[in-house]
């Protein structure tokens, strides 16, 4: 039995989380809260979710011993949780399956979503196609340009992709537009948020659907090695892949937990040069919950930067804010340059192309492995595959595709 029982009934992780939304959204949020409370322990719902994870998404994903990388570093032994091998290419499908099944039970016929890197958009469009639901995806104009492959995939799946031209034209603005849509179409629309942000119950619900990552990794490590790993590493934008890995280990205090944010051009260059609210932000309210965010003294959101579209978000899930303050997890930041280097290292040494988001975790995992001895072990969450980033990397490095 876990000693960790957050959030409370009102969605609070101590002083973080909660429900901070306009009155016009209250009905929809409380309808969702009641529905999730009703179905999350329902045996038929759980069975259908687990069967879809197995037979549709392709779970369980492997825990792969990165022998070549471990040997090269001469430090800790590195294991990769291969979420990149899921159907659609990332961890995002775990959550979209769960929320789409809930939407069907609530009688909703239309699905909306926001997306940055496009992986959540693809995963949402995928489950919507399978369940016969209308699908609309909001995506920042900047992200549409740098993730054109995923835009095409969403359209092939039958989704309508709406470029968002307001603000920084990235993930934050996509989430804003999706919420505006939801307000106007409450009766027939279900909003599938892709990360552990938003008002309660989203941070809890998305965590619960993603927690399969850590449950599997814990059992797999025990079977392959015995005992527990010494450390966990995962990238953090909103933070769903990270909490998916971390959650099963929170009570295991011998396991060190590291979340890795996007340092972009460098933390020292100011808030517009990175996307690292836990490392260099302050506390405020964003997208319906209290958390760490990138904001100025007047409470205005500062637009940040990351080479990875999925990390380019000015806030973070409230559970990560709590884990930071409580000291249970530590949060680091990796620059664009370091992430690119890690991308090439893993690709050339292990034959695995990680997403640029995941490359941030790989980069810090490499640093950590060098500090630890050979008798130590690290699990790195490889949250997605890097096919979507090939053109971005080629453009940066001046390579013709």
From Swiss-Prot:
Keywords: Amino-acid biosynthesis, Aromatic amino acid biosynthesis, Lyase, Pyridoxal phosphate, Tryptophan biosynthesis. Transmembrane segments: none annotated. The modification N6-(pyridoxal phosphate)lysine is found at residue 92. Disulfide bonds: none annotated. Its EC number is 4.2.1.20. GO terms for cellular component: cytoplasm. GO terms for molecular function: tryptophan synthase activity. The keyword Transmembrane does not apply. It is an enzyme of class 4 (lyase). It comes from the Bacteria. The keyword Hydrolase does not apply. Its cofactor is pyridoxal 5'-phosphate. It catalyses: (1S,2R)-1-C-(indol-3-yl)glycerol 3-phosphate + L-serine = D-glyceraldehyde 3-phosphate + L-tryptophan + H2O. Pathway: Amino-acid biosynthesis; L-tryptophan biosynthesis; L-tryptophan from chorismate: step 5/5. Belongs to the TrpB family. The beta subunit is responsible for the synthesis of L-tryptophan from indole and L-serine. Tetramer of two alpha and two beta chains. This is Tryptophan synthase beta chain. It comes from Vesicomyosocius okutanii subsp. Calyptogena okutanii (strain HA). The gene is trpB.
